[in-house]
Amino acid sequence: MAVSGFEGFEKRLELRFFDDDKPITKNPMGLRLIDFESLDQVLNEVQCTVVSAVANRSFDAYVLSESSLFVYPTKIIIKTCGTTQLLKSIRPLIHLARNLGLTLRACRYSRGSFIFPKAQPFPYTSFKDEVIVVEESLPKSLCYRKASVMTPSNNPSRAWHVFTASADVESDEHVVVVEVCMTELDRVNARSFFKRKGDEKNNSDSAGKEMTRLSGIDNINANAYICDFAFDPCGYSMNGVDGDRYSTIHVTPEDGFSYASFECGLSLYDNGHEDISEVLSRAIDVFRPSDVSIATTYGGEDYNHEVTKRVERVLAKKLDLKCRSRLMDEFPGSGTVVYQSFTPRRK
């Protein structure tokens, strides 16, 4: 293991709002009306920038120098890796939303366990300190609050940290969010995310498209429009846009601290979309990692134990990954989180 390297594990923040004149009729664009200059100022505080972007009728998707930002009419998702100061975005985003007549309804902050925890700035050296900073940034109206550290017995160093706050005890979000964290990537597969000789002639967008094709990422969801970006000399990010559904992948391929993440939002009961277990199988197969963790957040959807078991069966059958730990916790106003840890059967 390297003494120091780039921190791949992301910090993730999700803010959900409601319109003071609900339903949203006067301002159907909602948060999407925030001008780019204002967003750029927020990202400057976080210590990252926009490197590529795409939009459709439902939302705006930005690839950042450190991960991704998604802006929906009443929801913002921002995840950043490295040593970024993600929590500095909370207050300015709430302020920008208030100027549009939107009031904060719920907040969720989550992250895995850092590979290089000592390299993180305050408050990210302690989850307890992070929770304090988040709580101080939120209005008192978000009174249903909970912090939890979900620690798998097979690998305590890969805990999942979650803090939620909501104005309502029942969740308003009928979307399931799946977050996959992968470490110790297959070395051959990881080579796809290094720029090759001659790539200096291409820009980062075209090099990113080549990485998308060579790695097989374009096969994970054939219906998605992919906005991708290749970093120099290595590393990769992409956002996928499919109707009102997003997906995102980030890769730190260096040996010794290799890491990749895959995230998507979906409905379990939408017949127009694929079985999540098959999607996860294809995403994980791109990287062939030695360690996989999957955090699934059931918002307004009821927790579905059969989906959890199906994911375990498919990953065992197709990728020879065995589920070593399965944890579950409930968060008022934010739903149920299931955290699964996998390693190859040979381990």
From Swiss-Prot:
Keywords: Decarboxylase, Lyase, Polyamine biosynthesis, Pyruvate, S-adenosyl-L-methionine, Schiff base, Spermidine biosynthesis, Zymogen
GO MF terms, alphabetically ordered: adenosylmethionine decarboxylase activity
Residue numbers bearing the Pyruvic acid (Ser) modification: 67
Top class in the EC scheme: lyase
Named cofactor requirement(s): pyruvate
Catalytic reaction annotation: S-adenosyl-L-methionine + H(+) = S-adenosyl 3-(methylsulfanyl)propylamine + CO2
Associated pathway: Amine and polyamine biosynthesis; S-adenosylmethioninamine biosynthesis; S-adenosylmethioninamine from S-adenosyl-L-methionine: step 1/1
Pfam families reported in the protein's UniProt record: SAM_decarbox
Domain of life (superkingdom): Eukaryota
Gene null: resulting phenotype: Reduction in the length of stem internodes. Increased thickness of veins in leaves and inflorescence stems. Altered morphology of xylem vessel elements. Altered homeostasis of polyamines. Hyposensitivity to auxin and hypersensitivity to cytokinin. The double mutants of bud2-1 and samdc1-1 are embryonic lethal.
Positions that bind substrate: 66, 254
Family per record: Belongs to the eukaryotic AdoMetDC family.
Task of the protein: Essential for biosynthesis of the polyamines spermidine and spermine. Essential for polyamine homeostasis, and normal plant embryogenesis, growth and development.
Entry protein name: S-adenosylmethionine decarboxylase proenzyme 4
